[in-house]
Amino acid sequence: MEQFEAISIEQAHSRWQEGGVVVDIRDPQSFAAAHVPGATHLTNETLSDFVRGADFEAPVMVICYHGISSRNAAQYLISLGFDSVYSIDGGFEAWQNRYPQDTQAQA
């Protein structure tokens, strides 16, 4: 995969239920208030640790606020050598509206 693929909320939810990796690039306050359970909060500060411990062959789904910023982040992960990276269309706002039961606040 040389470029990320944009996927729908439904596709992302299905892949998440199958154990797919979700990285959330929103600001710390938004992430703390609510996020996809099991998501990694990916920031400039946590990126190197994430990359160091990552399975580059495992699919990675990037979520942001509305599905715009995640596109750049997804392409960046591709440039780092990740094989399969997806940008979630609609972002966390759409996820929370469609799957309110599948969100959690930071403990």
UniProtKB/Swiss-Prot annotation:
Ranges where the Rhodanese domain occurs: 16-104
A cellular component annotation (GO) from this entry: cytoplasm
Top EC group: transferase
Protein name: Thiosulfate sulfurtransferase GlpE
Classification via InterPro entries: GlpE_sulfurtransferase, Rhodanese-like_dom, Rhodanese-like_dom_sf, Thiosulf_sulfurTrfase, Thiosulphate_STrfase_CS
UniProt lineage: Bacteria, Pseudomonadati, Pseudomonadota, Gammaproteobacteria, Enterobacterales
GO BP of this protein: glycerol metabolic process
Recorded family membership: Belongs to the GlpE family.
UniProt keyword terms in alphabetical order: Cytoplasm, Transferase
Entry EC no(s): 2.8.1.1
Protein species of origin: Pectobacterium carotovorum subsp. carotovorum (strain PC1)
Main function: Transferase that catalyzes the transfer of sulfur from thiosulfate to thiophilic acceptors such as cyanide or dithiols. May function in a CysM-independent thiosulfate assimilation pathway by catalyzing the conversion of thiosulfate to sulfite, which can then be used for L-cysteine biosynthesis.
Catalytic activity: thiosulfate + hydrogen cyanide = thiocyanate + sulfite + 2 H(+); thiosulfate + [thioredoxin]-dithiol = [thioredoxin]-disulfide + hydrogen sulfide + sulfite + 2 H(+)
Active site: C64 (cysteine persulfide intermediate)
Pfam families per the UniProt record, alphabetical: Rhodanese
Entry's localization field: Cytoplasm
Domain of life: Bacteria
An MF annotation (GO) of this entry: thiosulfate-cyanide sulfurtransferase activity
Gene: glpE
